[in-house]
Amino acid sequence: MERIMFRAKIHRATVTQADLDYVGSVTIDQDLLDAADILVNERVDIYNITNGNRLSTYALSGPRGSGVIGINGAAAHLVQPGDLVIIAAYGNFSEEEARTLEPRVVLVDAQNRILDLQPA
């Protein structure tokens, strides 16, 4: 049996932009994607700490060192610049893999610079 497990998150990121007219997705600073081991086009869930909204979308790469967290498309109705969010990724793992999984947690400051990397 495979289990769907939490494997990575970017915790308490600040949304820097929202573009209702863009065709879906979330744009994330490539440094943050690398730190969280989230790939371009990978499905991610976004949990809005500010207002409680939740949504699923896919990740796009933003410029390295920019701190960009850009909510694109219809999701811009649910998340606004300045909101705090958690961006989480999940994966399918065998029973054995699931029991030894150590998720990556990327903690960031108000400018979305990496403060710490830790297991969940």
Curated annotation (Swiss-Prot):
<protein>
    <recommendedName>
        <fullName>Aspartate 1-decarboxylase</fullName>
        <ecNumber>4.1.1.11</ecNumber>
    </recommendedName>
</protein>
<dbReference type="GO" id="GO:0015940">
    <property type="term" value="P:pantothenate biosynthetic process"/>
</dbReference>
<keyword id="KW-0963">Cytoplasm</keyword>
<feature type="active site" description="Proton donor">
    <location>
        <position position="58"/>
    </location>
</feature>
<feature type="modified residue" description="Pyruvic acid (Ser)">
    <location>
        <position position="25"/>
    </location>
</feature>
<keyword id="KW-0456">Lyase</keyword>
<comment type="function">
    <text>Catalyzes the pyruvoyl-dependent decarboxylation of aspartate to produce beta-alanine.</text>
</comment>
<feature type="active site" description="Schiff-base intermediate with substrate; via pyruvic acid">
    <location>
        <position position="25"/>
    </location>
</feature>
<feature type="binding site">
    <location>
        <position position="57"/>
    </location>
    <ligand>
        <name>substrate</name>
    </ligand>
</feature>
<comment type="pathway">
    <text>Cofactor biosynthesis; (R)-pantothenate biosynthesis; beta-alanine from L-aspartate: step 1/1.</text>
</comment>
<comment type="similarity">
    <text>Belongs to the PanD family.</text>
</comment>
<keyword id="KW-0704">Schiff base</keyword>
<dbReference type="GO" id="GO:0005829">
    <property type="term" value="C:cytosol"/>
</dbReference>
<comment type="subunit">
    <text>Heterooctamer of four alpha and four beta subunits.</text>
</comment>
<dbReference type="GO" id="GO:0006523">
    <property type="term" value="P:alanine biosynthetic process"/>
</dbReference>
<dbReference type="InterPro" id="IPR003190">
    <property type="entry name" value="Asp_decarbox"/>
</dbReference>
<keyword id="KW-0068">Autocatalytic cleavage</keyword>
<dbReference type="GO" id="GO:0004068">
    <property type="term" value="F:aspartate 1-decarboxylase activity"/>
</dbReference>
<keyword id="KW-0566">Pantothenate biosynthesis</keyword>
<feature type="binding site">
    <location>
        <begin position="73"/>
        <end position="75"/>
    </location>
    <ligand>
        <name>substrate</name>
    </ligand>
</feature>
<keyword id="KW-0210">Decarboxylase</keyword>
<dbReference type="InterPro" id="IPR009010">
    <property type="entry name" value="Asp_de-COase-like_dom_sf"/>
</dbReference>
<keyword id="KW-0865">Zymogen</keyword>
<keyword id="KW-0670">Pyruvate</keyword>
<dbReference type="Pfam" id="PF02261">
    <property type="entry name" value="Asp_decarbox"/>
</dbReference>
